[in-house]
């Protein structure tokens, strides 16, 4: 039986989700909300949605499933608004927020006693690109799609959502909302604070030591890439998870103090252990085998300074899920190769390594 799906928010996540739903459920009607006329037009022209509006309340009563792919504050406001609307009996309401406790708490407060079902969710996928124009049906492939069930979630609700989103090819997992926020504070939210703090510190330092900007490359670039993230979104994330974030900051201060004291005392063994333990722990995490935000698989190639060499490599890699290519111009010991190529999945990474190794004499390193 065909359903009507209402996606509120036609940015990268919402528009990509619409494409994924249509892939497995072409008979479903997908309605879209967005304040931006441009985003609505793109989604309609490219067949991501069937109808669009800038009036959130207008389509809500028509939907069998409502998915809020919006900033956290707006998601909370719309949940409160949905509580006062005449919705279909048994409608499923879900979201895509990066923090869950605040959203789930509001849903349980405002939707309790209504003939609706709610399940919090967080698709851990993203890109450096934004907006409906960058929508990608494969955005969620192999990434974790986290559900945070609550008192408003029944077992059949989860099964219906998994069926609806089957075309995303994501990896569904269920976790308590509070535990979700604790985990993501450490592996997602706090790293953004570190990256932005390091970037700001370097900018101030470079005012007196101007060569710092010129020499910043390799490891520095890797550590600060996420400092380019959208400020409004991250302000909202931190303020909706403030207690856990503050715990992470306090814990990290202690670790900095410990290594600082070791340096001050000249404790070579403690310093060595600091780096060695971190190296061993990172290797044990098998980060590339996990779905997650901006998950990618990187390959480095030492290529000669010859005409068309990059074009030759790209020809070899035709048909792979190449998502980014970067030329490392700096001659630094922490740069594995001149050409850095990122792939969406491990299969294409392995295929690329084999193709380049078999057809060239270039040195290839997988990071």
Give residue ranges: language-model regions.
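Small-residue-rich helix-loop
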Residues: 267-285, 289
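A conserved regulatory-domain signal marking ACT and ACT-like small-molecule sensing domains
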Residues: 281-367
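Interdomain hinge/lid region at the active-site interface
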Residues: 208-275
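Rossmann-like NAD(P)(H) cofactor-binding subdomain of soluble oxidoreductases
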Residues: 81-132
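Rossmann-like NAD(P)-binding element
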Residues: 57-86, 91-92, 98
């Amino acid at each position: 039986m065909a359903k009507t799906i209402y996606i509120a928010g036609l940015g990268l996540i919402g528009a990509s989700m619409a494409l994924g739903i249509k892939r497995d459920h072409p008979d479903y009607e997908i309605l879209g909300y967005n304040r931006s006329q441009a985003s609505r037009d793109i989604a309609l022209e490219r067949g991501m949605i069937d109808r669009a509006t800038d009036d959130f309340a207008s389509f809500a009563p028509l939907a069998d499933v409502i998915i809020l792919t919006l900033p956290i504050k707006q998601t909370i406001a719309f949940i409160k608004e949905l509580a006062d609307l005449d919705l279909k009996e048994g409608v499923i309401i879900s979201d895509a927020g990066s923090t869950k406790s605040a959203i789930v708490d509001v849903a349980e407060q405002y939707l309790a006693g209504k003939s609706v079902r709610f399940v919090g969710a967080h698709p851990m996928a993203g890109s450096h690109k934004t907006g409906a124009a960058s929508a990608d049906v494969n955005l969620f492939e192999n990434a974790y799609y986290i559900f945070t069930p609550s008192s408003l979630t029944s077992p059949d609700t989860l099964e219906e959502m998994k069926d609806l989103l089957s075309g995303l090819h994501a990896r569904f997992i269920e976790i308590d909302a509070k535990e979700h926020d604790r985990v993501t504070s450490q592996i997602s939210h706090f790293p953004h604070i570190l990256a932005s703090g390091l970037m700001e510190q370097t900018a101030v330092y470079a005012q007196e030591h101007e060569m710092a900007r010129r020499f910043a490359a390799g490891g520095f670039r890797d550590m600060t890439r996420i400092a380019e993230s959208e400020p409004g979104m991250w302000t909202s994330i931190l303020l909706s998870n403030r207690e856990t974030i503050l715990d992470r900051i306090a814990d990290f201060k202690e670790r900095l103090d410990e290594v600082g004291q070791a340096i001050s005392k000249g404790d070579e063994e403690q310093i060595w252990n600091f780096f060695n333990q971190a190296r061993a722990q990172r290797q044990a995490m098998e980060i590339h085998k996990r779905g997650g935000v901006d998950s990618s698989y990187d390959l480095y190639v030492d290529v000669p300074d010859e005409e068309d060499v990059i074009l030759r490599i790209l020809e070899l890699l035709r048909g792979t899920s190449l998502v980014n290519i970067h030329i490392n111009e700096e001659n630094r010991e922490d740069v594995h190769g001149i050409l850095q190529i990122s792939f969406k999945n491990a299969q294409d990474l392995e295929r690329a390594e084999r193709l380049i190794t078999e057809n060239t004499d270039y040195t290839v390193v997988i990071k």
